[in-house]
């Protein structure tokens, strides 16, 4: 399926297919994907190839176009995603780099536009809380940024 925006990826889960391929997704904002079950393969406009099986947390940086293939493994494909605005990512970066040097984030600029991390205890619940609050606007901006920092700390 040829598409343009990331909203198509979220709604594609309702199509209930064993495999799904979406071409030309433009990431205007960074995206955090919680892959619970299934397998995902992503090719980016910069030539990176990413493959992961659930449970896995996947971060994709903004300003790139991706081609994504998702398929069932032993269970039905199950994933959710959250778009992250630039201000939240910048706040998290500054928090880890300047306020908590014990995280020792590297000072070199990353060469990839993606990150992968296994889903640890509590991460899925925090992701689900943030995902549902984005729809219902229940949480304050401060609480959302705290939860985003928690999720992004999985990649350190």
Model-derived regions: residue spans:
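An amphipathic alpha-helical interaction segment
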Residues: 109-156
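N-terminal regulatory/effector-sensing and dimerization cores
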Residues: 2-105
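Short intrinsically disordered, low-complexity coil segments enriched in acidic
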Residues: 1-5, 153-156
């Amino acid at each position: 399926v040829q598409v343009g925006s990331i909203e198509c990826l979220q709604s594609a889960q309702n199509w209930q297919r064993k495999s799904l391929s979406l071409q030309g997704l433009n990431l205007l904002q960074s995206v955090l994907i919680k892959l619970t079950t299934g397998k995902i393969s992503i090719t980016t406009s910069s030539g990176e190839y990413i493959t992961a099986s659930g449970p896995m947390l996947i971060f994709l940086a903004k300003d790139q176009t991706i081609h994504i293939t998702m398929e069932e493994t032993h269970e039905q494909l199950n994933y959710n995603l959250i778009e992250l605005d630039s201000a939240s990512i910048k706040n998290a970066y500054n928090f880890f780099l300047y306020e908590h040097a014990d995280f020792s984030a590297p000072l070199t600029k990353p060469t990839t536009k993606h990150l992968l991390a296994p889903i640890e205890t509590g991460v899925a619940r925090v992701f689900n809380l943030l995902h549902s609050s984005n729809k219902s606007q229940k949480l304050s901006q401060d609480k959302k940024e705290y939860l985003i920092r928690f999720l992004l700390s999985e990649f350190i």
